[in-house]
Amino acid sequence: MVDNGGPKPLRDCDNHFGIPDDSGGIPRHVEHANAVAINSIKICAAAAKHGSHVIIENPVARGYKSQFAIKGRERHSSLWDFPPMVEFAKQYGMQVTVFDQCHLGASTQKTTQLLCSPAVHRFVNQTLGPL
């Protein structure tokens, strides 16, 4: 990854649960981020299981396999690559909408992905996307 002076990535394409530190362990702040993501997924799964609609928002993947790849971000791993998220999406038949936030008045492009419950996907896709 390109060093732009910002924080170092928590994950990469080979380490979806976190980039090991020098001792080979996952840093505490990455474990905390994983716990936040996993608990969020559990909440969404409970809602979906009881018939509620779910929409999860996060930036698109930017790694070398992504249609939205960015030079210098070849090893990028997004929330969408996180194994518990992949499993949740499969289990509940979640569907994807991708859109640029500038179409909604944002000052930058910020290509964003939404993971939607099947019952709301058509409306979300017609309203915001697709790219």
Give a label for each model feature.
Residues M1-L131:
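Conserved active-site and SAM-binding loop architecture
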